[in-house]
Regions:
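Short C-terminal tail/terminal secondary-structure segment
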Residues: 1-2, 148, 228, 239-257
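Conserved glycine-rich cofactor-binding loop
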Residues: 9, 16-17
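Short, small/polar-rich loop/turn modules that mediate ligand/substrate recognition or access, typified
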Residues: 89, 175, 180, 238-240
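Substrate-binding pocket helix/loop in short-chain dehydrogenase/reductase
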Residues: 99-100, 107-112, 208
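Active-site helix of classical SDR
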Residues: 123, 159, 167
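Alpha-helical segment proximal to the catalytic Tyr-Lys
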Residues: 128, 172-176, 236
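Residue(s) in the substrate-gating loop at a strand-loop-helix junction
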Residues: 143
Length: 257
């Protein structure tokens, strides 16, 4: 699927790996100028090189999204330099795997800082640009663990659930200004984060894969396509939704025997 994002400007956090990198590359291939943000410099530079080699327009910024002042300043700077901000994808994530009795308050706060509070920061800053311009689309990346319980992921699950409801509220506040906000809700996707989970909890990961109705995990390209759709004019009458992209897992009532 080819999307027409020519002339548009997009900010993607967590944009140098997995779902974020695939989204960055897809938007650039479709004509957008992509502002790729992540913490790790090496992966940022690799992403920049790949996009430029394919003829895309890209900037990279080393950013910890939990630094609210830095994130808000970046959004304002991008909008000022480019004269617009059309799209935002909040994909940066933090996860701690532990039983609740072993989870520390620092772990809890870190996951909320990245998965929920940073989405608030980025969305608020983007709204200040998009609402007066009467154009814009924001996609926030949640998780099926936000709507289905997963052991040992309490802080991650709770923060991703908060993200879904925040997105819906922000969508209602922005709808009259022609600014749309939606979530994608990935299931098991072949990313570094899920591979890390599989190493730490192999039995749970194996059972999760077996229980997917489509009998396979997803790949980052499939998530990037869903994100691009929600960002695009093809979704111009869609706002406030949480779109599962999970092979049917969240729709399933009973696990297979």
């Amino acid at each position: 699927m080819n999307w027409d994002f020519e002339g548009r400007v997009a900010i993607i956090t967590g944009g140098s790996d997995g779902i974020g990198r695939q989204t960055s590359e897809l938007l650039a291939q479709s004509g957008a100028t992509v502002i790729v943000c992540a913490r790790g410099l090496d992966k940022l530079e690799a992403t920049r090189a790949a996009i430029e080699a394919a003829g895309g327009k890209v900037e990279t910024h080393q950013l910890d999204v939990s630094d609210a002042d830095a994130y808000a300043a970046l959004v304002a700077d991008v909008a000022a330099r480019h004269g617009r901000l059309d799209m935002m994808v909040n994909n940066a994530m933090s996860v701690h795997y532990a039983p609740i009795e072993h989870l520390t308050l620092d772990h809890w706060r870190k996951d909320f800082a990245v998965n929920a509070e940073a989405v608030f920061t980025g969305t608020k800053a983007a709204m200040a640009v998009m609402k007066p311009a009467r154009r814009g689309s924001i996609v926030n990346v949640s998780s099926t663990t936000a709507i289905r319980a997963a052991p040992f992921m309490s802080s991650y699950s709770a923060s991703k659930a908060a993200l879904i409801q925040f997105t819906a509220v922000a969508a209602m506040e922005c709808a009259a200004h022609n600014v749309r906000l939606n979530c994608v809700v990935p299931g098991q996707v072949q990313t570094a984060g899920n591979e890390d989970f599989a190493r730490k909890a192999p039995e749970i990961a194996a059972r999760t894969a077996e229980a997917i109705p489509m009998q396979r995990g997803g790949n980052p390209e499939e998530l990037a396509a869903a994100i691009a759709f929600l960002l695009s004019d093809a979704a111009s009458y869609i706002t406030g939704i949480a779109l599962p992209v999970d092979g049917g897992k969240s729709a399933q009532l009973y696990l297979p025997s």
